[in-house]
UniProtKB/Swiss-Prot annotation:
Major localization class: cytoplasm
Keywords, alphabetical: Cell cycle, Cell division, Cytoplasm, Septation
A cellular component term, taken from the record's GO annotations: cytoplasm
Gene3D superfamilies, A to Z: SepF-like protein
Keyword Cytoplasm (UniProt): yes
Protein name, as recorded: Cell division protein SepF
Entry's localization field: Cytoplasm
Acidic residues compositional bias, start-end: 21-31
Disulfide bond annotation, renumbered to this chain: none
UniProt family annotation: Belongs to the SepF family.
Amino acid sequence: MGVMNKLMGFLGLENEEYIEETTTVEEEREEQESSHKRQPAISRTNNVVPFQAREKEGIRLILCEPRHYSDAQDIADNLRHRRPVVVNLHRVEKDQAKRIIDFLSGTVYALNGDIQKVGDTIFVCTPDHVDIQGTISSVLEE
């Protein structure tokens, strides 16, 4: 037991004398109420993301010029990976461009993102963590 006591003493786990404190019922209630106020909700801690991790990643903006409707899935995949996308539709026929925008609008809606028209054939699609501020007006509107 001597070796065990020395090891416990080295680790700071040696037997210590405990002093009992007497508290009143009111003090115990105050402690319980204050401890309930200090405890955060469990659901809040589940969504914690280290700030430094986001800072190192940065935001990558993707530029796309689809030529076919099938390219819309690649654009949607970028949005799913939380990357904002600028889509230039000037190389696509008008009916195909409308289908692509319809597809991307559904994707953006499902991801709680945003889509805005910034030119005649240019759209910006963003996931939920990117905000678009301001508007671009055309020369004809002025």
